[in-house]
Amino acid sequence: MFAVPYEILIAGKEIKDLYMKSCQSDLSCYEQLCNTGISHDAAAYATPQGLRNVLVISATPYQWKHMIGQRTCRRNTDETRIVMLNIWQKLYELSPALFAPNLTSPFCQKGACREGKMSCGHPIPSLWFPIDILKVDYPILSERGTLS
């Protein structure tokens, strides 16, 4: 029901329990607000940021390549990177010719980081596929079999 940030996922049980308790408390508040007649939209402000949502994106191959290039950068949030790396992996499986790493990847993987002074300083090897990036940057997901 709740998205657990990778950093919390790999933390100790005490940290995970604290996070889940907070999420559950916020969700209970949301339910109480709805039960008093507050609209779902207004009550949603009480929900935890970690509440899972459904995201629908429609894009052309060119648009996907652009989003993947921006959102798989190591400076992005883990949640965004994991989602976009999984999307990229699925697109690559559908069309390797369109979504190969030399055509679709973080900018650092295609030659040069566009972040300038804000670069993470850890470029992704040019031959890595999205599944390789996921396995290296998020090994717990790989161990648990939760990669796409």
List each model region and its residues:
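Family-specific signature for flavin-dependent thymidylate synthase
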Residues: M1-S148
